[in-house]
Amino acid sequence: MESAKLYINRCLQLARLGEYYVAPNPMVGAVLVQHSAAGDTILGEGWHEQYGAPHAEPNCIRHAEEAHPEGIDYKHCTLYVSLEPCSHYGKTPPCAELIIRKGIGRVVVGMLDPNPQVAGRGVKMMREAGIEVLVGVLENECRELNKRFLCLQEKHRPYIILKWAQTQDGYIDITRETRGDKASTPLVISTPLIKQLVHQQRAENMAIMVGTRTVLLDNPRLLTTHWSGRNPIRITLDRHRVLPAESKIFSNEAPTIVYRENTNWSFILQDLANRNIHSILVEGGTTLLQHILDSGIYDEVHIEVSNIPLPRTANQEPNGVKAPDYTPTTQPKVVNNHQIYIENLHK
């Protein structure tokens, strides 16, 4: 079992190489190992590299055959894969059929695929073909890797991360009214390093969401300017149809979804699930964030707390927007003298 854990852990490392490119598919890695009296030999490795492209298993087998043109004794090999091989025709042929056709003697699977089109059928096909199959090695780690994909499959909604930065005394911004004048300049709370990490978060999630007021006041582009990977799909609300057509959120740099007629949170989540969007990073203001917090439908909360308070007016009265009403229960990490709280509720 220890060697199985070692190889599945390697599968997880490989799977992460496709992190910014395979959504809404899961990240998957595979390792082909030949066993002999002299010990184990890794013949090939592979991962799911691009949405719509070959899966980890055929990539692994192709790599092994290219590296060993003399031929491979598949009967004495074990294929380690972090997620159950698929059993259906989609954008690619079934991986389970390829494994059977190659005559691989043993397969070790990190976790079953909850996709209704698979859901144990891949394992069943391989076992019926006489292949020894072990399931559930490092299952918790495999689930954590693909928490976004699993949320969409099991809860039929996107994985939701709420994020905001606040001052030491609990404000997310100064009070602002309009876009374009000096008074509308937002309060800068995050450090340059943390801003870069936020762009990494944008790349990790399929969509990013802000409210009407954020678009009106900040006119954000909501792209991954400071990180590699795809730009997220942009989502906003415009129930009163007040967003200017020239707003940067409507640029052709990334798709944008605007909810006007129905801004109910449950409806939005169902609609996004129907669009196969498996994750949302919510960077909105207090109104949107508090609405979602009050609904109880979210998975993670990320809060950055600055080491300085809100700038005060001459009479020392705070003139700012209060942060959402939320009390972290975890211990913070300290980055650039700012406290970072990461609350994970999906486990």
Identify the meaning behind each predicted range.
Residues W265-S266, Q316-K347:
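Conserved histidine-centered catalytic loops in small-molecule metabolism enzymes
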Residues E2-A23, L152:
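Short, basic/aromatic recognition patches
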Residues P114-Q117, N140-E141, L216, R241-P244, ...:
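Short gly/pro/ser/thr-enriched loop/turn and capping motifs at secondary-structure boundaries
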Residues V28-A38, K163-A165, Y341:
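Short beta-strand scaffold segments in enzyme catalytic cores
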Residues L288, I292-V301:
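Short acidic amphipathic segments
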Residues L32-C142, I233, H291-L293:
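Zn2+-dependent cytidine deaminase-like catalytic core
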Residues C151-L281, T286-Q290:
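Active-site ligand-binding patch in enzyme domains
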Residues G105-D113, M209-V210, R234-H240, V258-R260, ...:
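Short internal beta-strands
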